């Protein structure tokens, strides 16, 4: 059973940090679920949409369907316009209810696989159409944006947005490849990356995770890419043995760079010796939405730091 990290701040601040990190982990686990068949009835254009995750909200805005949204999840905080939208509740079943959802009289609900499946039968009983998000890679995000654009009547906007994002991604990956090629005769190499999801016990990201896809597209090599599980528990001994070049820590974890450096034996790591420890915005890394490209871009800059 996952243990809570040691409390090193005030009780109030730690509770907020734990809430953010738990939400982050829930988002990650849900984003790696197997692709499911969602409702494909597109003979209508929804006018009263409820989005139950931050990533879904960002996708709706990205394809131009923001004026059709009647409510969003409490965790939806981007773009800034979401602050003025009514909130339907949190991300999981403990803070969501069918009664609250029905009070907004939606004709379409945007769900996340693995988290909102308990609502499906009830939505069907109330003749409310839905879509189940299950993206586990950037290419999945592009496909989902196209589907949502078509469903909401914004197919052209979705195509334009996806084309633009694909071009942005291509520029990033091309640049990363050029940097590696240019330094082929030097000591430069593809950098090994350790992403710390949790530290008690240690948890990282495997090959089937959304974060692994971001690391690879940025030009890095995930030290746990050999593990199939999306977010496996790993040993500290293995982390030390892998000797990563880069250490990434989610900002919401409350873990400081100094605390990483002070861990027993970690001072021998390349990443620690060369000060290559970074606090990263886990909202970008954990949300399978259009800003995943920003996550790739930010990580590519880190990887290209000499």
Residue locations for each model-derived region?
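Bacterial Sec-exported substrate-binding components of ABC uptake systems
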Residues: 3-8, 16-18, 28-58, 96, ...
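Structured C-terminal subdomain patch of bacterial secreted/periplasmic proteins
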Residues: 47, 142-145, 150, 159, ...
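A short, structured surface patch at a secondary-structure boundary
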Residues: 48-114, 223
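Short secondary-structure boundary segments
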Residues: 53, 113, 197, 227, ...
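His/Asp/Glu-enriched short active-site or ligand-binding loop at hydrolase and phosphoryl-transfer sites
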Residues: 73, 208-231, 251, 279
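Short helices/loops that flank or line small-molecule/ion binding pockets
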Residues: 96-105, 121, 125-126, 234-243
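A ligand-binding cleft/hinge motif common to bilobed small-molecule-binding domains
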Residues: 115-125, 246-263
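Extracytoplasmic ligand-binding site segments that recognize negatively charged/polar headgroups
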Residues: 118, 133-147, 190-210
